[in-house]
């Protein structure tokens, strides 16, 4: 009988888990991506990548280099190349965990940069970002 009540209690407890509106959360993530992009345009790439990073965020860059932690990410982008560059992107796909605590996006990006001679170069690619919901209900990336 104890087993029956334990199973019954467990089923009730698990069925009471709050349901999330995944479409609403996907819109939150899309809006976060656009706010991130806007901050990079208005306040600089270093500040944008710093502000939207979780404290333990990791970014993977050239030659499989990992930059770990938001301070190191800011330092990575705080140089003349990125100060003279701009970046645009938009998620083509967004998915959200069943409990609404994590999400990921991918899509196309375009970096535009000027060299010392003033010549402009463009770099295109595909990004993949993993987002984590914070205790204040904002989203920060943990992987980019």
Language-model region placement:
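A solvent-exposed, acidic/Ser-Thr-rich amphipathic alpha-helical stretch
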Residues: 23-30, 44-95, 108, 119-123
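Bacterial Sec-dependent N-terminal signal peptides
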Residues: 1-25
